[in-house]
Amino acid sequence: MPDRTGPLLRTPAWRALEAHLAELQPLHLRELFARDPGRGERLVADGAGLHLDYSKQRVTEETVRLLVALAEARGLPERRAAMFRGEKVNVTEGRAVLHVALRAPRGERILVDGNDVVPEVHAVLDRMAAFADQVRSGAWTGFTGKRIRTVVNVGIGGSDLGPAMAYRALRAYAIRDLAFRFVSNVDGTDLAEAVRDLDPAETLFLVASKTFTTLETMTNAASARSWLLAALGDPRAVARHFVAISTNEAEVRRFGIDPANMFGFWDWVGGRYSMDSAIGLSTMIAVGPEGFRELLAGFREMDEHFRDAPLERNLPALIGLIGVWNANLLGAGTVAVLPYDQYLDRFPAYLQQLTMESNGKRVTASGTPVEGHGTGAIYWGEPGTNGQHSFYQLLHQGTHLVACDFIGFCQPLHALGRHHDLLMANLFAQGEALAFGKTAEEARAEGTPEPLVPHRTFPGNRPSSTILSDRLTPRTLGALVALYEHAVFTQGVIWDVDSFDQWGVELGKVLANRIVKELESPAEPALAHDGSTNALIRRYRARRGG
């Protein structure tokens, strides 16, 4: 019987991969392509409008076969089915994990504790659509009767990163007579700069907090309310300028928001998986209900692909499994996400939370320490071609092995002369350069002076994948996000970690709540931290002024 939750490194499937690595390790990508010139047309997969070329990864078809065998041995098909059925796969919190229900079509049945949640999802979507149409048309006015001109989303984590990324990604489809701003940091600078040039009478705040008690979000929301009331004077104005995305009606009412303007979601939606729930209200206002439905359709297409496609042709499974291969067997513990589209400039930051908060775990789902291997690769990146002039030097000639995901589109949203061909030429060139490099002989053949040959040599053999789609649309964005959501799930199953909790964020919160009282105390507090923290607190209190 397969061992689905035991130590990964002791499984026969893992040992088979280690034996395969010993055979493959000496082979450079140059040699792999020379031996098999057709791998660039075979080591590819398609789904939900996305094309994945993983032929420049340090894998062969045998590698993929062994990775699929590992996935089956670790129970990926069964765990995937359990998630789609609404079982409580978030084991540490005893919750279902059903972001897939947020994009399920009307009429589909998905049960949580015996209740079909799909009608509830569509009821919220319908309310969101009606409200978005009001704001977009000008039918929703502020307290003084002025039309809303700026929407400010106030949230943090998944309540900010997803909506902010989606707005920037879909600006080409956004309504142009509304401005959108996003406030997340408890640093007062974030809010102050966001509202500095706004007219309170024309500003609508969307406050996104499931409990309506999140420290950063509610601190910003309270300051935003004070800013509004300083200008408009009447507490009744709050009801026309604030909307809640929450499930805590009592706190929403206490804040001054009409519960009729509260949009809820469910405990089976994790924050970093929530951009297509009511958390995405700012996105719906920006691109309209129809654009949001297209976004959901892209999510759904990738959900169905992940659920139904064979693992060897399954995009999320391939990205997840090759990521495990790179991190745990090749030693590439970091992934550079490199979108060659300026609209996706916040996509790497979004993926940081999705991947690192999900799989950055040191214990298994059952609470035993992870044995002998890493989890949760470090994700980072910048849009191309900007990154080429900053950190690509390290990618090509540095001592760290960094796996790369290139993302590009065949059709530009703004066809300006040669711009798009130049952009895509750089994308293709970078993948080629990382894979094949430049030998010393090639450098000499170019006339490079001998003392410079070591500096002009590129080792190559740096793994990368390329994801191509025809055009960046709401639908392709949904598919792209769902691709990584399910890749994260795949890796969590292999590593046997709970990809849907985030206990690691708790300790800092508890300590901060204690320290803020010490910072605000009018009397000198009796500090009982370590020597460093005590000294820093005393220095801050002495020098903060005011």
From Swiss-Prot:
* Function of the protein: Catalyzes the reversible isomerization of glucose-6-phosphate to fructose-6-phosphate.
Residue ranges crossing the lipid bilayer per the database entry = none
Q: Which reaction does it catalyse?
A: alpha-D-glucose 6-phosphate = beta-D-fructose 6-phosphate
Q: In which pathway does it act?
A: Carbohydrate biosynthesis; gluconeogenesis; Carbohydrate degradation; glycolysis; D-glyceraldehyde 3-phosphate and glycerone phosphate from D-glucose: step 2/4
Which GO CC annotations does the UniProt entry carry? cytosol
Q: Which domain of life is it from?
A: Bacteria
- Similarity comment: Belongs to the GPI family.
User: This chain belongs to which protein, by name?
Assistant: Glucose-6-phosphate isomerase
Q: What class of enzyme is it?
A: isomerase
What InterPro entries does UniProt report for this protein, alphabetically? G6P_Isomerase, G6P_Isomerase_C, Phosphoglucose_isomerase_CS, SIS_dom_sf, SIS_PGI_1, SIS_PGI_2
Q: Where in the cell is it found?
A: Cytoplasm
Task: Name the HAMAP family on file.
Answer: G6P_isomerase
Top-level taxonomy: Bacteria, Pseudomonadati, Myxococcota, Myxococcia, Myxococcales
Q: Name one GO molecular function term.
A: monosaccharide binding
Assigned EC number: 5.3.1.9
Keyword line: Cytoplasm, Gluconeogenesis, Glycolysis, Isomerase
According to its UniProt record, which residues of this chain constitute the active site?
E357 (proton donor), H389, K509
Q: Which GO terms describe its biological process?
A: gluconeogenesis; glucose 6-phosphate metabolic process; glycolytic process
